[in-house]
Amino acid sequence: MTRKEYLTKIKEHLRNHKREWFNSLDIVDGKTVGLKFYGRSIQRLTVNGVDFGGMWDIPTQKAFLAEIEKALDY
């Protein structure tokens, strides 16, 4: 899956499933990405086995997606 497709998948979940967990392990542009979040709080974010930790109560969807993009650039 491409980076754009992956971010679209996350945006869709944020819009349509605000009170549900998102838990996935995907291949994004050749990188293994593990992500678990609820609302705008990231429980787990890993890229190729490197753990980027958790972040709580990220204020906006734009900032939330920016954190994920920053990890994808690793």
Regions found by a protein language model. Give the residues of each.
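Negatively charged, low-complexity tracts enriched in Asp/Glu with abundant Ser/Thr
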Residues: 2-26
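Intrinsically disordered, low-complexity N-terminal regions enriched in serine/proline/glycine
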Residues: 5, 12, 36-37, 51, ...
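Residue-level detector of alpha-helical secondary structure
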Residues: 7, 11-15, 62-65, 69-72
